[in-house]
């Protein structure tokens, strides 16, 4: 005998791929008589070769399909549910063969069919409950023309029995009624045992057997308890009198039975409970409540006492030392009188032992003002070495650990953007540093005697120090140069390049005076000062004398040329 494979649909073949005993999900058509598809053919819409046969419709994509799980998948899905058994019912979620609604339970399916499809639409369908039931799976006639009638005749009674058997048994919770005072015998309440003896006789026999097996002390306690329980039934005996007298001088409350046919001589005795006073007893008989006028007078007397105490208090006065304090005088001029009284009250209530003023370090001491000299001669000292700071402060803040968020630093979603942002900032800062380095190297090459050679990249300052050694950058001048204001510039006549035939060229002044002006920033680089103080008076006189003699000769030559020019038009005759 061949053992069927676990998790396969035995005896079923796929009409799409013709594979027998396939595994996985099985899809059963609820319109066609015998049409099944595997999971692969259902998802790819492989419906196989269908031949047109009389009275047999061809399968269409719109036909409702019922999902049937394999045994392995069923156990995995409904594991731990004692009401689901694959051997009894292999379908849990049903599909309507009319409107193709899925996800219906047995009860929901029946309600849906009876309410939505009471009349047959005119074609036969397959009942999904018959397919899911193992006992009805191999029945030949599974098709029905009226599903509502089929449900009422076949499945309704079976489903009711199934629901009744699977529903959990609900029991009412036991409610303990409070024990009330026992009353007398009621009519028709006396119970008898199976042998015909009263129930009290059985209890008495059991009680007697219990008394024989117990000690003398316990016997006495049980006997007293028995007498107490039988007091309502025997009101005239001696035990009831003893019990009532033990309660003191309290009056006995006797309540007659409400039953009309009961013996009128039988009375019910109720033992009053002992009361414990909440408040201690008082000698007077005024009662618990206080009259309203008395209460009002008491409140008024308390208010009067408070006012009297306030009047008796001595007024707040200032001490002699406080009156002479300059800070207190200034403070009084800036705040109101109420604030002054409040401060005095606070100072009076929080008085402390007077301490020596000399032993305490002042909070604020004014630093003596120093006259500022040149910027190079001003020296600063730290507060720890020299005089104390002008305003030392002490801040009390919350620790950073208490306000931090630990989850933020452990979450990778936040750390990754921070890392990327940090890398971008580092890259941008490196680029800026390289640009500045190139500019610095260009300046160094222009000002150094020879180009520095950086043999060790980690120590570039050594090469720079050797290259810039002639500039003496680290040495301070023995005497500071005094600042001199720039002199007014004299406008010199401009030379016309058209008349002179020369291009105007700006020649920088490389003299000591010009270099100083360029460094100080008074004159832009490359601009020649139009008036230079380096020209001495003697040179000016020589230049002036030479210019005067030369000017006379030039004037004579110009006069001769003018006379010649004037004689030219007389000699030329124009006919």
Swiss-Prot record:
Pathway: Protein modification; protein ubiquitination
Compartments where located: Cytoplasm; Late endosome; Lysosome
Cellular component annotations (GO), alphabetically ordered: nucleus; plasma membrane; synapse
Zinc finger (ZZ-type): 9-73
Keyword Glycoprotein on entry: no
E.C. no: 2.3.2.27
Catalytic activity: S-ubiquitinyl-[E2 ubiquitin-conjugating enzyme]-L-cysteine + [acceptor protein]-L-lysine = [E2 ubiquitin-conjugating enzyme]-L-cysteine + N(6)-ubiquitinyl-[acceptor protein]-L-lysine
Top-level taxon in the UniProt lineage: Eukaryota
Residue span of region Disordered: 277-306, 530-575
CDD domains in the cross-refs: ZZ_PCMF_like
Keywords: Cytoplasm, DNA-binding, Endosome, Lysosome, Metal-binding, Transferase, Zinc, Zinc-finger
GO BP annotation list: regulation of cell communication; regulation of signaling; synaptic signaling
The family this protein is said to belong to: Belongs to the KCMF1 family.
Name of the protein this chain belongs to: E3 ubiquitin-protein ligase kcmf-1
Native organism taxonomy: Eukaryota, Metazoa, Ecdysozoa, Nematoda, Chromadorea
Gene name in the database record: kcmf-1
